[in-house]
């Protein structure tokens, strides 16, 4: 194997990179965390950099920055895989970002795929490590869920970020959820796996 392009992200990339093939080209969406830039007292805050690249050339298409708090034992920034919108939310990519105001909170953002501009931004009282999940209902509308450090799963409208419902998972959630038909399955620190019915 031979690298054809390299980009210095300035920090760790723990969140899975997502790829999209369109009529305009093939693109990557990615975000880093706040880790190496804060080591040994170098910084108490740094930006989580959300970026879109041309997947074939490495050209940076756009970048959106969100300031995060550095914590030596738990990293801020993006750790979960973003939602790559499709169907009725095909214009957006959605990221959850940890520690955007303190070492306990977070932010969920939906960005326009073409421009990187914010479509909506939602302040999270508790940060989220796990990947958000989108799914389509029987009426053809897309919904999304995410789980947080406080042990709750939230149902959102991805068009505007509005919370529609929530349920307790009894402990912090690091795992990413899976869905089959109308049942979401996820594990938590409660040492349990939950099957959540969505209506």
Predicted segments, located by residue:
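Extracytoplasmic/lumenal domain signature
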Residues: 1-199
């Amino acid at each position: 194997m031979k690298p054809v392009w390299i980009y210095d992200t300035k920090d760790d990339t723990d969140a899975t990179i997502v790829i999209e093939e369109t009529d305009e080209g093939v693109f990557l969406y990615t975000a880093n965390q706040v880790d190496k830039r804060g080591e040994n007292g170098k910084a108490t805050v740094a930006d989580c950099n959300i970026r879109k690249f041309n997947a074939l050339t490495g050209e940076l298409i756009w970048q959106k920055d969100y300031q995060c708090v550095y914590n030596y034992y738990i990293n801020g920034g993006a750790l979960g895989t973003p939602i790559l919108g499709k169907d009725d939310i095909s214009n957006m990519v959605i990221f959850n970002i940890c520690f955007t105001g303190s070492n306990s909170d977070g932010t969920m953002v939906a960005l326009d795929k073409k421009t990187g501009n914010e479509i909506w931004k939602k302040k999270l009282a508790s940060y989220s490590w796990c990947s958000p999940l989108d799914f389509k209902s029987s009426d053809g509308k897309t919904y999304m869920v995410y789980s947080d450090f406080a042990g709750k799963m939230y149902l959102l409208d991805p068009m505007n970020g509005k919370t529609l419902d929530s349920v307790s998972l009894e402990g912090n959630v690091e795992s990413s959820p899976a869905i089959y038909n109308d049942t979401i399955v996820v594990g938590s620190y409660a040492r349990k796996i939950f099957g959540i019915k969505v209506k």
